[in-house]
């Protein structure tokens, strides 16, 4: 690999002295709804405090990556609250050398080394995990229950987001729901424990820290909506006024580059908000450039009046941003266009149930004239797809879609394709008006923004039912079924387009003018009749004869009924009773342990690990695949 450019890394020399960083937060919340071994009740916490042995602070539960010490743990009415000290110069070096200097480009004075470290560790390890000893059936908690505290990306217990700062009071201050007695007790116990440490530092090794930090990133890289989850945990912990979770556009600090923005954000719904100069698109940050804009009822283009209504004021809608070479539409409307484009146009139907030919008239009373381009009257050629009304497969799909939509609405989730309902109350940084300040120190209870630029919102209490309803993996099967139903609808539309007679699968019929006394011709198609079957007209349907007179041209010889050539019988319809079982995937061998094991086998079985890692569920869409195979096989 090529060497990094001089400006890609921090240019200041790295000192040998560690910056003391205080960390504070809740180890658990009593009313969070944690289940199983993760649940901690007030009686258990009171029995475990104060701990007999000092509690170490490590990274991601790695025993060889100890970076600090827990100074104090107090029993708050909301849950156990701790204060710790991190003093590891090797951890600071690893973070500083791995970070690019472009992250901290900003207007105004540059950030100090302490501020850069706080931004890095707060964004990389925003959560904490308490490891407790596993209690047996008859065992009771004692002062050896707590084993250690680990810094991690996302903890399994709710409300375990921590704050980092270089001052003890500044680390505790953001927790607005912490009781005054707990705040004062934590401050007093932490100061006493820090004096006993007398400037101690920890040095687990650069290689061990690098391996552990990389493992943390790999184990959490597929975590869905990581920052939304951090936001929810942050609100549960009652954190407000903490600034070191701020970051912004292009992975730089807020205010890194001047951006020309309209007077009002384009998502506020103002008509003038979409009037953006053409040059502003090229200057916009990469994260904000998106070909599809979701809005709430704002007319983006007058090209599609059914989906994009013109404002009632009568003024023409402003031109969308860009040079005019592409169209900006909502994602839900785009999906409707794609699905509707493949649907065939309805053909005009006659009274007999088949399409009426253009420029032709039906047989009238005896002696009436005939059209020069009248096709043979063969009603049985046209399959049932030409008749109006949904097919049984369409009715099943429509019923399934309606049931899924009703279930989502009953569960409090927005229906698919509804851009007007948001799953969370957060706002993006470009939604804030010019009068809103991100650093308003006059409002101590305000919810300040954090990465990736969420504006403050109204404070909300802890809602365990909402957290349980939006837990990961709840509606993965329903989402997969919705995708399967959409694919079936599109495939059905393509099939209807291909099988629409007489333009799709039937060969063109020659113009024929029957003579008096001739039997009505019949034609067959190999794809529509079974083997050894010939369709003949019913005996009571005798055609009307044309008027007597010389023919304008020589009559075409009548068509002779032809039998369909015998073909292979159709495959039997699979059923649930005769369907072969799905192949069973072989079990994967356990992954090899790295150079830094989390703990020995005996210790791992005796501790309760409260950190979480991203889990890839390979069986998420298996139910949807079975549904698709059954629907396709029953057609």
From Swiss-Prot:
Disulfide feature: none
Organism from which the protein derives: Human herpesvirus 1 (strain 17)
Entry's family note: Belongs to the herpesviridae capsid scaffolding protein family.
Region (Interaction with pAP) residue spans: 324-343
Record lineage: Viruses, Duplodnaviria, Heunggongvirae, Peploviricota, Herviviricetes
Gene Ontology process terms (BP): nuclear capsid assembly; proteolysis; viral release from host cell
Active site: 61 (charge relay system), 129 (charge relay system), 148 (charge relay system)
GO molecular function list: identical protein binding; serine-type endopeptidase activity
GO cellular component terms, A-Z: host cell cytoplasm; host cell nucleus
InterPro entries: Herpes_virus_sf, Peptidase_S21
Compositionally skewed regions (Pro residues) per UniProt: 536-574
Keyword Calcium annotated: no
Site positions (Cleavage): 247-248, 610-611
Keywords: Host cytoplasm, Host nucleus, Hydrolase, Phosphoprotein, Protease, Serine protease, Viral capsid assembly, Viral release from host cell
Official protein name in the record: Capsid scaffolding protein
Region listing for Disordered, in residue ranges: 409-476, 514-606
Domain notes: Region of interaction between pPR and pAP is called Amino conserved domain (ACD). The region of interaction with major capsid protein is called carboxyl conserved domain (CCD).
């Amino acid at each position: 690999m090529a060497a990094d450019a001089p400006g890609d890394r921090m240019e200041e020399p790295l000192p040998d002295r560690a910056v003391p960083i205080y960390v504070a937060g809740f180890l658990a919340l009593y009313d969070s709804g944690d289940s199983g071994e993760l649940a901690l009740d007030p009686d258990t916490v009171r029995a475990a405090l104060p701990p007999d042995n000092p509690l170490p602070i490590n990274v991601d539960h790695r025993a060889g990556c100890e970076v600090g010490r827990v100074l104090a743990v107090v029993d708050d009415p909301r849950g156990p609250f701790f204060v710790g000290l991190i003093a590891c110069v090797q951890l600071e070096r690893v973070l500083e050398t791995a970070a690019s200097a472009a992250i901290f480009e900003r207007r105004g004075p540059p950030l100090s080394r302490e501020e850069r470290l706080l931004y890095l560790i707060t964004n990389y390890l925003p959560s904490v995990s308490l490891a407790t000893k596993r209690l047996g059936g008859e065992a009771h908690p004692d002062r050896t229950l707590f084993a250690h505290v680990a810094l991690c990306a996302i903890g399994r217990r709710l409300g375990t987001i921590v704050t980092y700062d270089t001052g003890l009071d500044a680390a505790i201050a953001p927790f607005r729901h912490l009781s005054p007695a707990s705040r004062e007790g934590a401050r007093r116990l932490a100061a006493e424990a820090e004096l006993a440490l007398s400037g101690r530092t920890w040095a687990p090794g650069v290689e061990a820290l690098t391996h552990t930090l990389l493992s943390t990133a790999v184990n959490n890289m597929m975590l869905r909506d990581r920052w939304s989850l951090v936001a929810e945990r942050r609100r549960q912990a009652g954190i407000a006024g903490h600034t070191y979770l701020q970051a912004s556009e292009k992975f730089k600090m807020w205010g890194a580059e001047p951006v020309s923005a309209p007077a009002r954000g384009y998502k506020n719904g103002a008509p003038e908000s979409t009037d953006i100069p053409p040059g502003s698109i090229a200057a916009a940050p990469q994260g904000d450039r998106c070909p599809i804009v979701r809005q709430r009822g704002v007319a983006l283009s007058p090209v599609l009046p059914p989906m994009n209504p013109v404002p009632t004021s009568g003024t023409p809608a402003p031109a969308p941003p860009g040079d005019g070479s592409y169209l900006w539409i909502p994602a839900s409307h785009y999906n409707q266009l794609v699905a509707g484009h493949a649907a065939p146009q309805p053909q005009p139907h006659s009274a007999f149930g088949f399409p009426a030919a253009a420029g032709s008239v039906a047989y009238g009373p005896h002696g009436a004239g005939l059209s020069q381009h009248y096709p043979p009257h063969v009603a049985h050629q046209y399959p049932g797809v030409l008749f109006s009304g949904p097919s049984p497969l369409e009715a099943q799909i429509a019923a399934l879609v309606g049931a899924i939509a009703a279930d989502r609405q009953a569960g409090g989730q927005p229906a698919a394709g509804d851009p007007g309902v948001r799953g969370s109350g957060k706002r993006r940084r470009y939604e804030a008006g010019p009068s809103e300040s991100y650093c308003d120190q006059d409002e101590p209870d305000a919810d300040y923004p954090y990465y990736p630029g969420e504006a403050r919102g109204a404070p909300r209490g802890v809602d365990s039912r909402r957290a349980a309803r939006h837990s990961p993996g709840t509606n993965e099967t329903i989402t997969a079924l919705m995708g399967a139903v959409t694919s079936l609808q599109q495939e059905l539309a393509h099939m209807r387009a291909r099988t629409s007679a007489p333009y799709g699968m039937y060969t063109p019929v020659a113009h024929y003018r029957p003579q008096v006394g001739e039997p009505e011709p019949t034609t067959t198609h190999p794809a529509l009749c079974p083997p050894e079957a010939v369709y003949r007209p019913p005996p009571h349907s005798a055609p009307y004869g044309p008027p007597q007179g010389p023919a304008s041209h020589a009559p075409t010889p009548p068509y002779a009924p032809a039998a369909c050539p015998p073909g292979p019988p159709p495959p039997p319809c699979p059923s649930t009773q005769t369907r072969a079982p799905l192949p069973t995937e072989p079990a994967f061998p356990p992954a090899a342990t790295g150079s830094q094991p989390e703990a020995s086998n005996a210790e791992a079985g005796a501790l309760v690990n409260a950190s979480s890692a991203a889990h890839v569920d390979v069986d998420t869409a298996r139910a949807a695949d079975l549904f698709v195979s059954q629907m396709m096989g029953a057609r």
